[in-house]
Amino acid sequence: MAEANTPHIAIMPSPGMGHLIPFVELAKRLVQHDCFTVTMIISGETSPSKAQRSVLNSLPSSIASVFLPPADLSDVPSTARIETRAMLTMTRSNPALRELFGSLSTKKSLPAVLVVDMFGADAFDVAVDFHVSPYIFYASNANVLSFFLHLPKLDKTVSCEFRYLTEPLKIPGCVPITGKDFLDTVQDRNDDAYKLLLHNTKRYKEAKGILVNSFVDLESNAIKALQEPAPDKPTVYPIGPLVNTSSSNVNLEDKFGCLSWLDNQPFGSVLYISFGSGGTLTCEQFNELAIGLAESGKRFIWVIRSPSEIVSSSYFNPHSETDPFSFLPIGFLDRTKEKGLVVPSWAPQVQILAHPSTCGFLTHCGWNSTLESIVNGVPLIAWPLFAEQKMNTLLLVEDVGAALRIHAGEDGIVRREEVVRVVKALMEGEEGKAIGNKVKELKEGVVRVLGDDGLSSKSFGEVLLKWKTHQRDINQETSH
């Protein structure tokens, strides 16, 4: 139970590993400040997956995890988008959250602050009823946050589907973006996912503040614009990068010997390939990537999942149900056995990116993976699949210069020749060297912003001070 004078913070991510992982890092950062008590509140439509439990088990024992009863989504079609399921799970968890807060209130251990993620704004109703201060931790970047804050206005002023917009959208401080590159969730305005996201973004103004997982060296213009005061815009705190930097990451066992294999490779010679906890490729695309890697002649570690026609099919459970090796081209493993290591479902990504033999990362550009690569100074090949990954790619390729973009053909398939081209460009070409230098600069920027006097540390300190003050105010009210 939280001590009366100790600020008690409850944090509640939406379902999916990509949302859970940064919230776990936020919880760890909070308890490093020994005057905070943290409770992780976990919602879902099923009991937590093995991968989720392993991440939660890595938390310090001082952080309590509370699992809410599964939300009832029996009326939601199986074809519904993952965002629909995630947002409905959050909203339909409100009764269970209310019951939890009621119980904590009786025990005098109610949190002073509730931090939800981008899909959890409906939890504000419960927070306000219990006089708990509502905040958002936006686990993506400042460019996408700016888009989310702009979405209600965009919805009012644009009548067509966004992909038909003839001019790029220009939000202050952000990379201009064409409608077809907007995040997937808004590409069909009749879909429930769009309506639910719009509903959430309209409620962002109710938050007392928004923490964003980015930093000024990476997005100086977007962060500056977000921090300009405006009506109905909460204070934005850039506190990133919040990533797992542990050299002994207990979440993920190295069952397939990735690190010992890397130990035997030359310095800066290995390309790491992973599409995150949620990404999958179609059978045809899986095959083209495999052949392209073999034909490139470069060393690689490739994390594979069984192909699927749905690119986000492993979003809620990153482990393949079928044997992914059976989908590899005949002879692929023999052809690449001297230079490649193929790993099913999951690998110790943080340690792989930190290893001196790793020289590049072919990634879906999920924000957690992007930050992990930047923190370790590893240049990127951008292969966006779903969610806001096209927007992340635009930021990294066109604005920051930290990634090369891989290009699909008109049929949507990245051909083997393109795989060979971009892999060689990163690992051999002048363009790859320039990107490598830029990422090394960003890595140095990370050290600066997270230092004692760094901008992210100061920003985090500001929000912590607000939370301490709010807890003190609550204590004074209850003592009278």
UniProtKB/Swiss-Prot annotation:
EC number: 2.4.1.-
Family: Belongs to the UDP-glycosyltransferase family.
PANTHER family in alphabetical order: GLYCOSYLTRANSFERASE, UDP-GLYCOSYLTRANSFERASE 72E1
Class of the enzyme per the UniProt entry, highest EC level: transferase
GO molecular function, one term: UDP-glycosyltransferase activity
List of residues binding UDP-alpha-D-glucose: 277, 347-349, 364-372, 386-389
Protein known as: UDP-glycosyltransferase 72B2
One Pfam family hit: UDPGT
Alphabetized UniProt keyword annotations: Glycosyltransferase, Transferase
Species assigned in the record: Arabidopsis thaliana
A single Gene Ontology CC term: endoplasmic reticulum
SUPFAM superfamilies: UDP-Glycosyltransferase/glycogen phosphorylase
